[in-house]
Amino acid sequence: MIAGGKQPAYFHASANRFGRTVTISASGASAGYVALYDEPIFASDCSTISESESYCLDFVFYQLLCKQQTIYKAQTGGAQPHIHAKDLNPILFSFPSLPEQTAIAEVLTEMDGELAVLEQRREKTRALKRAMMQELLTGRTRLV
């Protein structure tokens, strides 16, 4: 269940959104957080955008990510911040032709893939460094 947060609040036996879905969390500390789900979800306490033939969902997702800080600034409420669909209305988005939306989304998705590979490599390198530090700084492995 997606309930206004960066992580699923809990799991639900059924879904109310099928196919790919963009969510914008509606309340709480993560109000305004934008996410894309590729599997069926049970969405609650969030605005959702589903796939359509009139726009590229990945493009919409990247548009929203690009405006993430603006969306956060649109929060209302005090101790319990909220973002409602009407709060997003003043935020301007540009939509080129569908083929261009698709091309832009493909480039950005490919870059995300490259970044994920680099992030994995970075984590592996960090783990290797930690292991080397343990070996070298404890004296188990000597260099001279």
Spans of features found by a protein language model:
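Hydrophobic (often cysteine-bearing) scaffold residues that line and stabilize catalytic clefts
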Residues: 56, 80, 100, 104
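Amphipathic alpha-helical coiled-coil/heptad-repeat segments
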Residues: 94-144
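A short beta-sheet element
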Residues: 3-65, 72, 76-77, 84, ...
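Generic non-transmembrane alpha-helical segments
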Residues: 67-70, 111
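Long, compositionally biased, intrinsically disordered segments
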Residues: 33, 81-82, 121, 129
